[in-house]
Amino acid sequence: MDITETDLDALKCRSSATKSGYIHDPFIKFFSPSRNSHKPPIINRGTYVRTWSIDHILQKFIESFDGKKQIISLGAGTDTRVFRYISEYGPENLKFIEFDFYPNCIRKIRTIEKHEALKQNIGDYVVDISGGSLVSGSLDIYSYDIREIVHKGFPGFVDFSLPTIVLSECCLCYLEPEEASSLCRWFQNMFATSGIVVYEPIQGMDNFGKMMKANLSARGVILKTLDCYETTEQQRMRFLDYGYSEVIAEDFLTIEETWIPIEEKKRTMSIEMLDELEEWQLLAKHYCLTFAATENLWNQIILQLPHLKT
């Protein structure tokens, strides 16, 4: 399995969770296969917690600042947040910059060009098929090796003065640990008002973690940073070391139990019967969401996220 194919796996999971009623996403139908299989309840639940928690932070970030905000998505693939957020907050308030491998960029660009509902969200745009890029007022897509950002900068224009959050959904973990560290430090140094949201597995050395790594390795997928950051506390210390002022890192079980409102939990739990409760709890403890921020961004956003404690 090529790393580029992991985006298709994630797409199938999001599509299943959307069709089952966990997630509201009117744009995923343009990307998902017409005959997408239903995922087991435990997978739908994990996809929901992942999507809800990331949306929770990013949307509160958008709502915490006036004027234009910027989201830089590493390994964005078929992620539909750009369309969901622009339709809700308006193109004048958001700039998305997305990076991925060439096949994933081309797949997204061609899907955008096919569907008016997607084109309307981003407005006028310019496409370079040979380079795998799309540039518009609210969305830029680049086929670009993110490791080169540290040495060569961004391939297009980036406004370093805008409040900015970098998003990595299982992307940084594919880099060598020193490469991931260099990139995170670069982001922290270059943006005055910034944060980073990172979703990735943890606890790779226990029995479940070893099984998870073996399954991924059998498919040709190696998470190179997994063994470096075993716990949520190690993830927290990692980003403090990068220079961020405030960091919170929680596993998915904690997020489900303490972040998600009771009524929302009741709604999602009524969708499907989850028989594998112990398996879910074990799985949820092996995935972590980290949110790190500069002091000025944290002080602004924490008013919208009073339940987050560092």
UniProtKB/Swiss-Prot annotation:
GO BP term (any one): methylation
Superkingdom of origin: Eukaryota
Any matching Pfam family: LCM
Reaction equations catalysed: [phosphatase 2A protein]-C-terminal L-leucine + S-adenosyl-L-methionine = [phosphatase 2A protein]-C-terminal L-leucine methyl ester + S-adenosyl-L-homocysteine
A GO-annotated cellular component: mitochondrion
UniProt-listed InterPro entries: LCMT1 (IPR016651), Ppm1/Ppm2/Tcmp (IPR007213), SAM-dependent_MTases_sf (IPR029063)
Gene Ontology molecular function terms on file: protein C-terminal leucine carboxyl O-methyltransferase activity
Residues noted as binding S-adenosyl-L-methionine in the record, renumbered to the chain: 50, 75, 100, 145-146, 169
Keyword list, A-Z: Methyltransferase, S-adenosyl-L-methionine, Transferase
EC number: 2.1.1.233
Similarity-based family: Belongs to the methyltransferase superfamily. LCMT family.
Biological function: Methylates the carboxyl group of the C-terminal leucine residue of protein phosphatase 2A catalytic subunits to form alpha-leucine ester residues.
Protein name: Leucine carboxyl methyltransferase 1
Organism listed in the record: Schizosaccharomyces pombe (strain 972 / ATCC 24843) (Fission yeast)
Source taxonomy: Eukaryota, Fungi, Dikarya, Ascomycota, Taphrinomycotina
Gene: ppm1
